Every structure is written in C-alpha cells, then in structure tokens.
C-alpha cells in the first residue's frame, strides 16, 4: 500500500504499433471517492509503442473525467526501447512531479474530486488516500491502436530492471489548493479590458 512516496522503476519498453507499457497507480479503495475517475489515477509512465521517443505522465480525476498530462521527448534520436531509463513519480501532499532519467518534465498541484451526492470535494482529494502500483503492458486500444503487420511479438519485451519505492519520514500535510493565476489582457485604445 502506498500513500506518499517517490517511486522509481528502471525499464526498457517494447517497440511497435499497439504496445502501451505503463507504470501507474490506482486507489486501494474506490469506495472512498467513487469509481474511476473520481478515485484518481496517477500514470507515472506511459510510452506508446509506435512513438517510443516520448513518455507521458498524467493524472486522472474528478467527474466528469478530467486529466492533466505532461510529455517528455528523449533527445538525440534515441528512444525508450534502446536502453534502460528511470521513470520517477514523486508524490507529496498537494504536488506530483514526474522525471525521466533525473530530469523534471512535469508537475501538477491542482485537481479535485467529486462523490455522488456530495458535489465537489476539497483539494487534495482524491490524491490523499493509499494507492497501489501497477506495471503492465497493454496491447491494443483506442489510444495506441491495434498491432499491425510490422508489430513484432518476438524478442520485444517490456523489461523492468527494478522498482524502488521510498517514503519520507514526514510531510507537510497542511496543503492548500494553489491560487488560480489571473491574466488580464492589455487594455484597448479606450482603456477597456
């Protein structure tokens, strides 16, 4: 059971249309806030098999379904199927941060949840409850499409060297929803906004 942590797998992904290797987290108990997406989901790493130079980090939450996503594109023509890479998801109260090979590429600190009959719940719900780790390789689906004639099923594994999970001794759990930044447009010639 995980609640507040820094999780670090090192993995090498398969290449080919229709593959979707992933490292993600789901709520231990969907009854706390309700079924997905109300219960929350943290995608620490997803890589599309036909686009193995890009990793996605995403949170899913709320009702109706909302998501916030960041992407990391590997440099110099390399891709995540060539070699092992570290994918880190640092989850603290009120903030989730994603890294690839130690490079920060995305941070989220604003979300919400809802439950049936209670309306919108206060931040940091739903990411204030225990989650569990899932490491899987999905094949096919609406996002990555189905495998095609060029997709190899032989000698094309999703390799995971290790998974490490750390938990800090203490956290600042008195988190507040970040204020929304308001941007005013420039006034027109008459001074109206």
Which residues does each PLM region occupy?
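GH16 jelly-roll
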Residues: 3-193
């Amino acid at each position: 059971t995980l609640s507040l942590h820094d999780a670090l797998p090192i993995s090498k992904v398969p290449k080919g249309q229709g593959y979707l290797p992933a490292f993600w987290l789901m709520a231990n108990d969907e009854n706390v806030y309700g079924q997905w997406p109300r219960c929350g989901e943290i995608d620490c790493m997803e890589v599309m098999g036909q686009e193995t130079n890009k990793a996605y980090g995403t949170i899913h939450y709320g009702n109706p379904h909302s998501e916030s996503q960041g992407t990391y594109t590997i440099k110099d023509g390399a891709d995540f199927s060539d070699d092992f890479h570290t994918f880190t998801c640092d989850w603290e109260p009120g903030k989730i941060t994603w890294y690839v090979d130690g490079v920060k590429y995305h941070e989220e600190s604003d979300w919400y949840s809802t439950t049936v009959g209670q309306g919108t719940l206060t931040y940091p719900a739903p990411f204030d409850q225990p989650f569990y780790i899932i490491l899987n390789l999905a094949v096919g689906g609406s996002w990555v499409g189905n495998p095609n004639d060029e997709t190899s099923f032989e000698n094309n594994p999703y390799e995971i060297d290790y998974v490490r999970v750390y938990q800090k001794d203490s956290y600042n759990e008195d988190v507040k929803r970040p204020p929304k930044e308001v941007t005013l447009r420039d006034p027109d010639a008459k001074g109206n906004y």
